[in-house]
A protein has these predicted regions:
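Internal helical hairpin/lid segments
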Residues: 232-287
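Conserved anion/nucleotide-ligand pocket segment
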Residues: 160-220
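ATP/nucleoside-binding phosphotransfer catalytic cores, i.e., glycine-rich phosphate-binding loops
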Residues: 276-339
Length: 339
């Protein structure tokens, strides 16, 4: 009898130890899943140095317009090795392109890093960035299109606000709207309204919502799914844009986001211009039908036709910044994108 009692006592102790282990494990996983705190980079001022890189496709056409604009604003410009490098279609080898980014974040004299071109290639280097280094040396990091991969990864891994911002082609005869958006995002330390720069957007669904902005180019957002760098949309405002995609492809990507649970708990949607989206067959859905089919039953504010991405003018969007949408006031208020 005594032996049975001893055994029962040991089993009970083992159960307690097991339950404690499970609790600690779950607590650890919960802590790991928590998003890092927001890190707001310092704003630009005349005399600051901006690093130019080509982390995706090689430079190709001239980036003179961007350089001239930055110099005219009183900024200094330095060039990464990738700026004039070429390896296949990329701005140098994966090593060169990743090292450019790591080196520029480590360089205390460089206050911002601007990408000059998208295309393809950032997914090849996303796992080669030193995210701890980036977190400890926060600064403006900007680009769009294929750069979406890095904008999301850096923001998700470090909490640093990144920028879905203009690249070389956007600086050629720069529209006033683009310049105003540039100034607010990169130099103004106050809150501002993303919708103040251009009134060509429309309201698809009225409402109010609040959360961090995340997103970028739709193809690259979808490409992040299932990876260590997967987009986190929970409790956030989703911004997506695309260019020259058939409407059935847009529909497929939106369905993939939905099936992955990425539309489940979002607080608002900002739809970009989706320039060049056309039916590939006569019986394909129109872009408007695709949006209605995917978002029609959602009870959140939705704005469409927002000018950011593969379009002129271009309004810079701070990825990871706190924002409030109020369609009744025609506002997307950015709390702060730089300090």
């Amino acid at each position: 009898m005594k032996n049975l009692i001893d055994i029962a006592g040991k089993v009970s102790s083992i159960k307690k130890i097991f339950l404690i282990f499970v609790f600690v494990l779950i607590s650890g996983l919960t802590l790991q899943a928590e998003a890092p705190a927001i890190i707001i980079p310092e704003g630009l001022k005349p005399g600051d140095t901006i690093g130019l890189i080509a982390p995706a496709n090689y430079k190709g056409t001239s980036a003179d317009a961007e350089v001239e604009y930055l110099l005219s604003r009183g900024f200094n410009v330095v060039y990464g090795r990738s700026y004039d490098s070429r390896w296949y279609g990329f701005g140098g080898t994966d090593y060169i392109r990743a090292k450019d980014i790591n080196d520029m974040f480590a360089n205390k004299n460089i206050k911002a890093i601007f990408s000059i071109r998208g295309g393809y290639g950032t997914i090849r280097i996303v796992d080669k960035l030193d995210y701890d280094l980036i977190r400890k040396n926060p600064k403006i990091f900007s680009g769009f299109s294929d750069l979406t991969t890095l904008l999301l990864a850096i923001n998700e891994k470090t909490g640093l606000v990144t920028f879905h911002g203009p690249m070389s082609s956007n600086f050629d005869k720069i529209p006033e709207t683009t310049e105003n958006g540039f100034n607010k995002a990169f130099t103004d330390k106050q809150s501002y309204n993303l919708l103040e720069f251009d009134d060509s957007y429309s309201i698809m669904k009225s409402g109010r919502g609040e959360g961090k902005i995340t997103g970028g180019n739709l193809s690259l957002v979808v490409a992040s799914l299932g990876t260590e760098y997967e987009i986190n949309t929970d409790g956030k405002i989703l911004f997506i844009e695309e260019v020259n995609e058939a409407t059935y492809r847009v529909d497929r990507m939106l369905k993939q986001l939905k099936l992955a649970g990425k539309l489940k708990n979002i607080k608002g949607i900002i739809l970009g211009d989706f320039k060049g989206a056309k039916r590939s067959e006569l019986d394909d859905m129109s872009l408007e039908d695709v949006f209605i089919d995917n978002f029609g039953d959602m009870k959140i504010p939705i704005i469409k036709g927002f000018k950011s991405g593969h379009v002129r003018p271009f309004i810079t969007v701070p990825i990871g910044a706190n924002a409030k949408i109020d369609t009744y006031k025609n506002e997307i208020i950015i709390e702060k994108s730089v300090k």
